[in-house]
Amino acid sequence: MSTASAFATNVPSFVNASSLKKSSTSSARSGVLSAKFTCNSSSSSSSATPPSLIRNEPVFAAPAPIITPNWTEDGNESYEEAIDALKKMLIEKGELEPVAAARIDQITAQAAAPDTKAPFDPVERIKSGFVKFKTEKFVTNPALYDELAKGQSPKFMVFACSDSRVCPSHVLDFQPGEAFVVRNVANMVPPFDKTKYSGVGAAVEYAVLHLKVQEIFVIGHSRCGGIKGLMTFPDEGPHSTDFIEDWVKVCLPAKSKVVAEHNGTHLDDQCVLCEKEAVNVSLGNLLTYPFVRDGLRNNTLALKGGHYDFVNGTFELWALDFGLSSPTSV
């Protein structure tokens, strides 16, 4: 990645156990039932010699072990394995039949019980979300929202991915009115074209010429599905999607560079490289917009790239090393 300046900022690491740590199927299977038995068997009769006691206390039979098979709620296979394990234990240890039979009945009843969890209500989620925003933010900061009612004058234009995990307002703590944000698959900026991808062109034009933003940021992120698609879709031949393949090929030069320089590298590592290189391609594409070049030449606009790694909780920011000169006539 060719950069004039680059720095990495460590940010607090927020770990989501449900998304970052998943048990594998193999580990789930092996952990379905774990029971360890220690059995001491001896034959005795009324005429047998009493056992020699370590302590002068009566000898009682060891209590039956507590057997607690575990299974996951998202499939029947683990449940069936738990039952099979109990049945196998019955064959080997017949004296535990009452305990195992009770546990089988309990497991079966729990598996058959209806799910009491309330179904997700999207309308209620939207309503409660707005109520929370209004009571905690809108009502508590009237000066800000009174000012926003008069208009907007953001300093930043941000291109970010549509991925639900990388909202720039949360990641960079943007407040309302601070950033004019465009989100699309893989945070890409296509070259200037009046007839194709006009939605992006309109956003850039509005941000630069009307809002007078001072910075344009293009921010990539870790584990981007759009970039993985770019790296795995065939460069030629029929498409398997209606829109996605054409769109991500906006940054095909990034893929070509990564493959040429890191051929043989594992796909996951290539994707990380391409996530950043695609940002550089988008920054280069911004230079094809005449009003962007004018802003750079007049020092009223700057372009920067970034990469948010939500796995490790880091953020990188850089500026491309490029120069613009005024045209000359011959």
Curated annotation (Swiss-Prot):
GO terms for biological process: carbon utilization. SUPFAM superfamilies: beta-carbonic anhydrase, cab (SSF53056). PROSITE patterns: PROK_CO2_ANHYDRASE_1, PROK_CO2_ANHYDRASE_2. It is found in: Cytoplasm. One of its GO terms (molecular function) is zinc ion binding. GO terms for cellular component: cytoplasm. Belongs to the beta-class carbonic anhydrase family. Possesses a transit-like peptide, but it is proposed that this peptide is not removed and that therefore the enzyme stays in the cytoplasm instead of going to the chloroplast. This is Carbonic anhydrase. It comes from Flaveria brownii (Brown's yellowtops).
